[in-house]
């Protein structure tokens, strides 16, 4: 099969289109014919060596496609089903991908492959942080930093879905997008607005940016009995800090896909390009430069 291979770890110029050996499905796995993959920040971290990786690997952490074979223990999927999954380090930049059944979710008929794959990683992190990490309840006031990113966008929607009053930070295009799509959300420009100007008013703050400055401001803006969650920080000397690690789950992905189908959630896609080494390099450069307006998608077939 064809795949995009990273010949030298840490060198994205060494990405090449290559022929690799076909995959064999094991008992608990599903073999998927790739239709779309998302370009995720974690792929860059794995590729540059900061999160593992190796020479000659295939990058990619999310996939949407068609089931072409199932292992003998698989019960929830059959050949021909449409599927989406987050498979960290799952080598998804390829014509076919192996997905453990526990990570897989069915794509509803009215959801495109691109829309489905756009939410399986960042969307899952955003949703789980609000629902399981911060355990947001109706009537609470929630602040989401980085609201226009894939994590922040779903965090906003999950908080609204829970019945919370929501504020968010963004800049540039993100400000306009959030105000257009979520008029009920108070949107701040993180470059110019002081989120703590009104004191400690938030019951829960989700920091999807991860900088020390943002985290410090978050605590200033959070009530004494409130909670703060960050996608980066793993420990903090403040009783309000929530320790939470998102575990990939097909069940959570199914919730998100069903939400897309019903209109309960939306996805925002920046671009769709054919999967190739050149386009992976292009999208990586765009992510690193900033200013991406939604999820970057690569398609197959």
Predicted features and spans:
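NAD(P)H dinucleotide-binding glycine-rich loop of Rossmann-like/cofactor-binding domains
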Residues: 85-142, 146
């Amino acid at each position: 099969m064809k795949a995009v291979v990273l010949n030298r770890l840490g060198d994205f110029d060494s990405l090449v289109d290559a022929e690799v050996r076909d995959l064999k499905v094991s008992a608990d796995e599903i073999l998927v014919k790739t239709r779309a993959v998302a370009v995720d920040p974690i792929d860059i971290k794995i590729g540059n060596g900061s999160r593992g990786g190796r020479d000659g690997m295939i990058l990619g952490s999310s996939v949407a496609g068609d089931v072409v074979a199932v292992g003998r223990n698989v019960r929830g999927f059959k050949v021909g089903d449409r599927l989406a999954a987050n498979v960290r380090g799952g080598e998804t930049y390829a014509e076919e991908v192996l997905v453990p059944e526990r990570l897989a979710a069915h794509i509803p008929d009215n959801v495109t492959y691109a829309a489905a794959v756009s939410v399986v990683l960042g969307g899952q992190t955003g949703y789980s942080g609000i629902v399981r990490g911060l355990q947001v309840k109706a009537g609470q006031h929630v602040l989401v930093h980085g609201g226009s990113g894939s994590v922040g966008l779903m965090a906003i929607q999950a908080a609204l879905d829970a019945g919370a009053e929501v504020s968010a930070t963004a800049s540039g295009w993100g400000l306009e997008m959030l105000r257009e799509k979520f008029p009920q959300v108070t949107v701040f420009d993180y470059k110019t607005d002081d989120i703590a100007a009104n004191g400690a008013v938030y019951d829960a703050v989700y920091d999807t940016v991860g900088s020390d400055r943002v985290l410090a401001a978050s605590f200033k803006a959070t009530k004494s009995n409130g909670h703060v969650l960050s996608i980066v920080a793993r420990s903090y000397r403040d009783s309000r800090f929530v320790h939470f690690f998102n575990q990939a789950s097909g069940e959570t992905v199914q919730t998100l896909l069903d939400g897309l189908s019903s209109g309960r959630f939306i996805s925002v896609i920046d671009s769709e390009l054919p999967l190739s080494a050149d386009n992976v390099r292009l999208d990586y450069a765009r992510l690193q430069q900033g200013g991406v307006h939604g999820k970057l998608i690569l398609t197959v077939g």
